[in-house]
A protein has these predicted regions:
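Terminal alpha-helical segments
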Residues: 1-143
Length: 143
């Protein structure tokens, strides 16, 4: 993906806004106890934040598994992001799959509630890394 600095900033800003909105949606549904919906919104909040990070660094993924792989390869393995945060991101993905597609198991408060604060912290860390990188980028196309 070849983007100018302005284009990259626009895409990254959009993803960050989507991450924040999805997290707010997750919080807003807690009182209704829609555990699958909360799991879905937590995952998509993290996914959009991680996607923004990858785009800021010029990485391009074409699937959810690709985003997980690139996040692990470029941020978790080198120690930029803690291993526990990489595992949390993968857990959010797995929980979203269970909530969206598993016809034999319904998520419960015990599955979902303990992940809200760690997900918020992960999203904040990833957005901070993204913003730091974006501050370094000049208005030149990616090579």
């Amino acid at each position: 993906m070849s983007l100018s600095a302005d284009e990259r900033k626009a895409v990254v800003d959009f993803r960050i806004e989507k991450a924040r909105r999805a997290f707010e949606q997750a919080q807003g549904v807690v009182a209704l106890e829609y555990w699958e919906t909360i799991a879905n919104r937590l995952y998509y909040a993290a996914y959009n934040a991680v996607s923004a990070l990858l785009i800021a660094y010029g990485y391009s993924a074409h699937s959810h598994n690709g985003v997980i792989h690139l996040f692990g390869q470029h941020f978790v393995q080198p120690g930029i992001v803690d291993v526990k945060d990489g595992k949390l991101y993968h857990r959010l993905f797995s929980m979203r799959l269970t909530g969206d597609y598993d016809d034999t198991y319904g998520l419960t408060s015990d599955d979902v509630l303990p992940l809200i604060t760690p997900a918020s912290e992960l999203i904040d860390k990833v957005i901070e890394l993204t913003n730091t990188k974006m501050a370094e980028i000049k208005d030149t196309p990616e090579e």
